[in-house]
Amino acid sequence: DHRDLHSFPTRRSSDLIIFFDIDGTLLRLRAKELSEKTVEALNRLKANGIRLCIATGRTPVSLPHFSGIEFDTFLTFNGSLCYNDTETIFSNPISPDDVQKLIRNADSLGRPVSVATKSRLAANGFDIDLSDYYSIAHLQLTVAKDFEQVSNEEVYQLLLGCRETDYSAILKDVDGAKIAAWWDRAVDIIPANGGKGIGIQKVLEYYHLDKSEALAFGDGNNDIEMLLSVGTGVAMGNASPQLKEVADEICKDVAEDGIYDYCLTHGLI
């Protein structure tokens, strides 16, 4: 299903959209700001009328505000909440019943969890894996006094420290949620019918765009669905082997300004 990739930039730019993962794709891991070349590429894409969409497992609360560039659209919680400046495009929270089961399952493993709503990230305890997971997004893990209240609001995602061997215990008796992992010490738990793929589908419908008018850049296993949901899926040079397998193209490493280089060589900027 490898299309003629050179057909992508020749359309009217206003009919194009590019989805970007954040960590390891736009941003070098643990960096706070985008490289100058990445900012330049994004601004030139935007000047050419191309829509720019952040597509991340992060919560709206932990979205970075990069200096020098504004994105049009945000696909957060691995696709469960998509919005732009004016409205919500798609909202798909986890059922309250499953949220409570997941909290109990984590508790039986001796693991604290963090619940993420549109406006809050609240944890019921502290452990080093969860704390380190927070720090990747430059957040400080603190225990929320109102955890119970927040966990009864619309929860889009749960975060907890665990290993792959714990996955089945965490999901015990849970029908409507699944694990989306991009790090070996912690997981995001999202709706079973969620994922970046469904989010992208909803964003494309909203803007009346076809799959062939969309491009995506990613680096982790949680980007596999995203790359398969667009006309042209590009894996970063630093991407996981599994992602490179499904990608239409592979660009340079994030540390070598892979996005800038790809956009330049493909005539997008």
Language-model regions, residue ranges each:
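Asp-based phosphoryl-transfer active-site loop
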Residues: 14-31
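Short, small-residue-biased leader/transition segments that mark boundaries at the very start
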Residues: 1-13
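Short, structured coil segments at secondary-structure junctions
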Residues: 69-70, 78, 173-176, 229-230, ...
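Asp-based, Mg2+/Mn2+-dependent phosphohydrolase catalytic module
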Residues: 150, 229, 234-269
